[in-house]
Design a protein with these regions (language model features):
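Bacterial N-terminal signal peptides that target proteins for export
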Residues: 1-11
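Bacterial N-terminal signal peptides
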Residues: 9-19
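Sec/Tat signal peptide C-region and signal peptidase I cleavage site
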Residues: 21-25
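Short aromatic-glycine motifs in intrinsically disordered, low-complexity regions
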Residues: 28-40
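Short conserved aromatic/hydrophobic patches within beta-strands of well-structured domains
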Residues: 37, 41-49
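Signature of long, low-cysteine stretches enriched in small and polar/charged residues
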Residues: 112-184
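Surface-exposed amphipathic alpha-helical segments
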Residues: 190-227
Length: 227
């Protein structure tokens, strides 16, 4: 992720560029080789691709590797309204869907997907040994995403929960700030996608929320791609 100061500058610049933009929220098809994959954001979120904002695209690019193609970057409806009204958005929750550029034109088999997911998991390390995630994250390097738990492991879905202790801003008596994220690898219509959900982590409600929304988004994407 980019430095917080740069992130805030980009957010401030977006206020002016999005102030007059219209709102649109609907499922859409993304051509990947000879296949079209259906995408949509969960209720309460809006895909931002239609805005055509270079600054917003830069924010999305900060969340993923340059080797991935961004298919969707969604923010909350409330944050989108804030942008368009010229107010400061919270940017506390957001989500992204990507696919490896090297696989855009390739039809991925179940065996290939299993290898891809296993390779991705192998680089995440071991999950936290307890459910006291703040305590676990306090022992990890600031700014580094750490594996907290494996959520699903199925032939076409592999999902994990991660957490990050955010770098200190240097304020006196500053409390630690945490970020939760889920990353899910999905096989949809022969295409390998990675979808991630992010939220600030202040307590159990945020943990419950991200697990629920992740599951709901997985189900939604599988449903609209089974037609």
């Amino acid at each position: 992720m980019m430095p917080r100061a740069r992130w805030l500058l980009l957010l401030a610049a977006l206020v002016l560029s999005l102030a007059a933009a219209p709102v649109r929220a609907a499922a859409f098809l993304v051509p990947l080789g000879d296949t079209r994959v259906a995408l949509d954001a969960p209720p309460g979120f809006a895909d931002t691709g239609f805005l055509g904002s270079p600054r917003l695209e830069e924010l999305a690019q900060s969340l993923t590797s340059a080797s991935n193609r961004i298919l969707l970057f969604a923010i909350t409806d409330g944050d989108l309204r804030a942008f368009m009204n010229g107010d400061q958005p919270a940017m506390r929750r957001y989500m992204i869907a990507v696919t490896p550029r090297s696989l855009v034109r390739h039809s991925v088999s179940l065996d290939e997907f299993a290898t891809l997911a296993a390779d991705a998991l192998r680089g995440l390390g071991k999950p936290a040994g307890s459910a006291d995630y703040p305590k676990f994250l306090d022992r990890q390097p600031a700014g580094q995403a750490s594996l907290l738990a494996e959520l699903r492991s199925e032939p076409e879905v592999v999902s994990v929960l991660q957490g990050t202790r955010m770098p200190s801003q240097g304020g006196y008596g500053e409390k630690p700030h945490y970020l939760l994220s889920t990353t899910t690898w999905l096989l949809l219509r022969g295409k390998a996608l990675s979808v991630s959900v992010y939220t600030g982590y202040d307590g159990p409600a945020d943990l419950a929320w991200i697990k629920y929304v992740t599951q709901r988004w997985i189900d939604q994407l599988q449903r609209i791609n089974s037609r």
